[in-house]
Amino acid sequence: MEKPPSPPPPPRAQTSPGLGKVGVLPNRRLGAVRGGLMSSPPGRRARLASPGTSRPSSEAREELRRRLRDLIEGNRVMIFSKSYCPHSTRVKELFSSLGVVYNILELDQVDDGASVQEVLTEISNQKTVPNIFVNKVHVGGCDRTFQAHQNGLLQKLLQDDSAHDYDLIIIGGGSGGLSCAKEAANLGKKVMVLDFVVPSPQGTTWGLGGTCVNVGCIPKKLMHQAALLGHALQDAKKYGWEYNQQVKHNWEAMTEAIQSHIGSLNWGYRVTLREKGVTYVNSFGEFVDLHKIKATNKKGQETFYTASKFVIATGERPRYLGIQGDKEYCITSDDLFSLPYCPGCTLVVGASYVGLECAGFLAGLGLDVTVMVRSVLLRGFDQEMAEKVGSYLEQQGVKFQRKFTPILVQQLEKGLPGKLKVVAKSTEGPETVEGIYNTVLLAIGRDSCTRKIGLEKIGVKINEKNGKIPVNDVEQTNVPHVYAIGDILDGKPELTPVAIQAGKLLARRLFGVSLEKCDYINIPTTVFTPLEYGCCGLSEEKAIEMYKKENLEVYHTLFWPLEWTVAGRDNNTCYAKIICNKFDNERVVGFHLLGPNAGEITQGFAAAMKCGLTKQLLDDTIGIHPTCGEVFTTLEITKSSGLDITQKGCUG
């Protein structure tokens, strides 16, 4: 940013070359000025539309739009104003006091000014003047410009980044990276996204969109749905549906349909980036200097790019055991969702949410499934809820082998699937066990993709224990122009919606007129096991750690969904509880639900928790009957009372 001149020079007019490029606008009030207001001499008059028309044709309108964008993109500060407007005068005086060169177009002194303002409104979504753009970013009107000046955002926008190829380069084309890229492009910035999928040890790769779209949330939820449909077919007979044909599942048909949908999403992302003017490069990004990055494509060809700012959004990949046969014969979630053959008898190693979700839908599709657990289920989640999830999985036929970890995977037979022998050792002693499986699925955690992108060359610090990147409350690393979002952040939730929100807000802070930060508190999530587990806020263990047990009240109950009654599904399996801070008006600090459609139910309660939900507010809420969600409006029994919470029927 240029320093304000002292004393300010007298006003002087400079004719801007920008209008000459536009051509359709008379050069009456467009000029460049430093340190004072400007009154440029009138220039050649040209009409916006053909003589005799009151409104430009569609072709002329598009031409006008293009030329207005040329003005916005070609000038550091572009002010659309009216000569008699006092608010416009205030803005001009502000930039003059800052010693900043600005360009103006007085809409009351151009031919067809109303049409110009109409198209400008479509571009900026602002009907009034002054209408200010700084470095291609729409700042807004007078009040927003002064607000941006007061909070420092205007000075940030005025920084000249023209020395670099791009305003922003994002490494990683997942949910967070794409969200950040699209928002930055919306703010008028020149953006590049680098995305490259290193094939899994089994050779699996995928398109643009990251883990969630390709090998995570989307295919996982669709396979979960496939399993639920199978269960619904069993219930259907109790509801009077008759069918004689034997029902069986076709794995190949399911994966083909799911991959077709994912392919459409990949293409949609590429189209969206193109429409927004974001450069997408399918290459591996690696820092070589503070503002310089090397992009290597699959052919090994290298290209170098520079940017003013960088966002690291590289995500994570599944971890391997580091034992004989793991990478040769085991698969991970990277491979499962596009597996071209039915996995058959499957051993799932690990009891993370990924492991239990996969075990759940595989069992729901009729497969023989065993889960090998080293320690606890769903580490980091409420452990009472985790054990209930495990119990329901066992009811659905999933077998658990606890306190064991594999030490060898050996191929006995080749095939699709083949046959594998797994040798596992007890975590509590010398005991070993063996098992024969068609497929071994590893779900033991994920590693951040941060160690091979040249961070050490520019001094970005990482947590050496887990590869994650420490950032401040605005996602900034220890290197000021380098930021990070998503699963690679140290100590932050590894959830797609979190990355999307963080990416969008980061772009707005970097290039817009917003100071809003991502709220990492009270984030809802759902584990999509056959009986879904939704939660928001603190686990019971974490709440006790933070508030002490004597300061908490836990309300809970079992319940029986109406839909389960006719089908004869087990009563007293679904469970709901809230954890309340007794000394903060019984504010709800933890929300937990095990039941059908838990994700859909939890979403709404998460919004309520952000607004300070209390037990009294729940009591005052009239429930929708008959639904599962209404159970939270009638909670009466506390854990401390020790009273029985079993239910006799669906209505309590």
From Swiss-Prot:
Lineage: superkingdom: Eukaryota
Location of region: Disordered: 1-62
Cofactor: how and how many bound: Binds 1 FAD per subunit.
Modified residues annotated as Phosphoserine in this record: 50
Active-site residues, as the UniProt record annotates them: 625
Localization per Swiss-Prot or TrEMBL: Cytoplasm; Nucleus; Microsome; Endoplasmic reticulum
GO terms under cellular component: endoplasmic reticulum; nucleus
Record's keyword terms, sorted: Cytoplasm, Developmental protein, Differentiation, Disulfide bond, Electron transport, Endoplasmic reticulum, FAD, Flavoprotein, Methylation, Microsome, NADP, Nucleus, Oxidoreductase, Phosphoprotein, Redox-active center, Selenocysteine, Spermatogenesis, Transport
Compositional bias of kind Pro residues: 1-12
Phenotype upon changing residue 651 to C: Thioredoxin reductase activity reduced to 21%. Glutaredoxin activity reduced to 14%. Glutathione reductase activity reduced to 18%
Domain Glutaredoxin: 65-165
GO BP terms in the entry: blastocyst formation; cell differentiation; cell redox homeostasis; glutathione metabolic process; spermatogenesis
Cofactor(s) essential for the protein: FAD
PROSITE patterns linked: GLUTAREDOXIN_2, PYRIDINE_REDOX_1
Gene3D superfamilies xrefs: 3.30.390.30, FAD/NAD(P)-binding domain, Glutaredoxin
Family: Belongs to the class-I pyridine nucleotide-disulfide oxidoreductase family.
Protein name (database record): Thioredoxin reductase 3
Chain's gene name: Txnrd3
